[in-house]
A protein has these predicted regions:
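Non-heme di-metal
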Residues: 1-310
Length: 310
């Protein structure tokens, strides 16, 4: 089992409705009614108020066309990220089935994999063909590294307890605020399945079986994850900067204020800490506390992070 290697092939082709397999997949997953991407107004899916742009001077000074472009791109980024997360779930489930310690675990992970395939079929029609070939962002790279390199006993904690738990909050926010009724219903349905995935992680995780190396691997992963959260909404910031044609550092800080970087990032970090703080893993959380991993970086530091990767 130790020789099993699974690759999270995020850029693998995905033909969707153009595939000869589509009717079978759609029939099994219920993904029968397809939205027309040409008719879908991405800028209306989540509002400027939801993002915080309604209080952003930089956004207010853009033309209506550019404001809509910002909203459309930001909203598309939510759907594209969800697409690749669910796609990653296929690789995760495959690895966990192949390395399961018993038939019960193999059954569970096969069922989780079926859920991920279903979610992927639901989201895929809302994502353009080009976007499906372009996995972007540090989080997707981080998730792929976990799935490909980390042992199954740690993945139960890092993926199912922490990332799936994080996903419950994220999908709940998307479902409650989405202005597209079918898409809102879709995210609400995904939320129910993800809750089961998260709970099963709590059942399976046994920290008493962890070695010192396991704890070191967990600490390294959690440091990376918390850092990605600490720097705030870098993706949305990049979209505003690109549409506006390049912003000054003070304008970038203004956008981060509107995006509620300090308050919302702090809320997310506290949630992350709560999910991490499982029995016998509390020492790792204490170490991260000592390293200030659950505090947002300042506005200036968040802007510096963005500018350095421009």
């Amino acid at each position: 089992m130790s020789n099993i290697h699974v690759r999270n092939n995020l850029d693998a082709p995905h033909a969707g409705k153009d595939s000869p397999l589509y009717k079978m997949i759609a029939g099994k997953t219920g993904a029968v009614s397809l939205p027309s991407l040409n008719m879908l107004d991405y800028s209306s899916l989540w509002s400027a108020d939801w993002w915080g742009f309604d209080s952003c001077p930089v956004y207010a000074n853009l033309s209506v066309e550019k404001q809509n472009d910002v909203l459309a791109r930001c909203n598309q980024s939510l759907l594209t990220e969800a697409y690749f997360i669910e796609k990653s779930g296929l690789a995760y489930s495959a690895k966990m089935v192949l390395t399961a310690r018993n038939t019960d675990e193999a059954q569970l992970f096969a069922l989780i994999g079926a859920d991920e395939a279903k979610h992927l079929a639901w989201i895929e029609p809302y994502v353009s063909a080009d976007a499906k070939q372009l996995p972007r962002g540090h989080f997707l790279s981080f998730l792929s590294n976990l799935i490909e390199e980390y042992p199954p006993k740690l993945l139960v904690y890092l993926v199912q307890i922490i990332l799936e738990g994080w996903g419950l909050d994220h999908y709940n926010r998307l479902a409650k605020s989405c202005a597209h009724p079918e898409l809102a219903k879709l995210f609400a349905a995904i939320l129910k399945d993800e809750a089961l995935h998260h709970r099963s992680g709590n059942v399976l995780f046994d920290a008493s079986q962890l070695s010192q190396r396991d704890y070191s691997l967990i600490e390294d992963a959690l440091q990376h994850y918390s850092l990605m959260v600490r720097v705030g909404p870098q993706g949305a910031l990049a979209i505003v900067d690109e549409v506006a044609g390049g912003l000054s550092n003070s304008d970038l800080q203004s956008v981060l204020v509107a995006l509620r970087h300090e308050d919302e990032t702090q809320r997310k970090l506290l949630l992350l800490r709560q999910l991490m703080n499982q029995p016998l893993v509390s020492r790792v959380v204490e170490i991260l506390d000592e390293e200030h991993c659950f505090l947002p970086v300042s506005l200036r530091e968040a802007v510096d992070c963005f500018v350095s990767s421009r």
